[in-house]
């Protein structure tokens, strides 16, 4: 008897369908805002309201600097030959968490005074972790597209226009919103190499990611602005921060791995057919 394929999801193997289900659960999971609220036992929005007036400007400046540093790392990585692995090693998520927890301890102890130093270091560690996860899912880190996709992960989960109807964007809607900026930046970098660092297309991509990433950085800083938060809770907040992006990266690059195997149309149809609610 011939196999029956009733739904798009049936075209994926059981193992790959399970992987896609796990990816959807993390990609459509509660926002960082809700995670921080759950950890701290108080709405993050109230903490944001208590931030000093100069906070937004400092956070935006630090975010831009942090993403520029990540872009420099990406441009230096491009074109380096990757060692082909039959089975890529698992990512070093725990090591990256421990490193980010250390920077969070400093941030918790010194607050906004540490921001210009802490955020670029923390963001670089998160970016390296995202790249490590991408590699574990079969991505080529010497590829322009892969590096820009890693940068784009930092823009997942934060929306600068929270009052708009589409503030809580689904994964494929958000991915589509970033796709054009990634494509134009990729073309510039492929054509101009490292000189594309200052091109309009690359600047636009950094701005697009920064507008979303800064929302989550603001939430992170608000959580660490509690009086006498100290180094311990500062480290805990940073650990939650990197865990959020590690989960986004695992989900995003799992979807991309399956798209390389089955095609984007089949994977998107299967994704939409899956119940993304957590199974407990």
PLM regions: where:
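Glycine-rich active-site/cofactor-binding loop and its immediate structural neighborhood
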Residues: 95-117, 121-124, 128
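Terminal, membrane-proximal amphipathic helices
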Residues: 1-103, 128-280
